[in-house]
Amino acid sequence: MSTYFDLIMIPLQLLIVFFTIYYFTLSFFGLFGRRPEEKIYDEQKTFAMIVCAHNEEQVIGQLVENLHLLNYSDHLYDIFVVADNCKDNTAQIARQAGAIVYERFNDNEKGKGFAMDWMFQRLFEMERQYDAVCVFDADNLVHPDFLREMNSRLCKGERLIQGYLDSKNPNDTWISGVFSISFWVVNHVWHLAKYNIGLSSCLG
């Protein structure tokens, strides 16, 4: 009986030990910051900033205003908001804040994935074509140098880039604090650590 039990438990324990060592080792490469690199701040790339929003009138205006304040030339990026099956004032508020708004209504295809696919089809048919597309949630806020950093990486030949994710209110409640810790772990143990040793990061 114990032999059959060992046949199950020993491989399982070895698997646990392997992943423990893997994550423990990997985490060290994310604890000491980003590896030194040269940055390119000559503004060369154009961006389409896309926000898919469903009934987000409480936050959409803040994000659009935030995107307009980025440290990057206004003529090099446009802000698009997809008001997806909205029943509130999301579209109106986004327009007033200065976004290019597309309203979408489809009772059968609901959700961010459908909205993004719908918007991408229209984006790629526009007369103006962009070097890159940035996707945001309606409740996001963006660092002023976001596009400068994205431009630098695109100029170096990178094609798919994951930005740094963090919470806006880590000290409000214990729940927001836990989310902040999870963001920190993912950013450093997964994204930054893998980047520092030349591995691919996951999108989140």
Show the residue positions of the predicted features.
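Short, acidic, metal-binding catalytic loop of nucleotide-sugar glycosyltransferases
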Residues: 65-76
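Long helical/loop segments within the catalytic core of UDP-sugar-dependent glycosyltransferases
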Residues: 105, 110-125, 149-204
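Cell-envelope/extracellular polymer assembly enzymes that use nucleotide-activated donors
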Residues: 45-48, 78
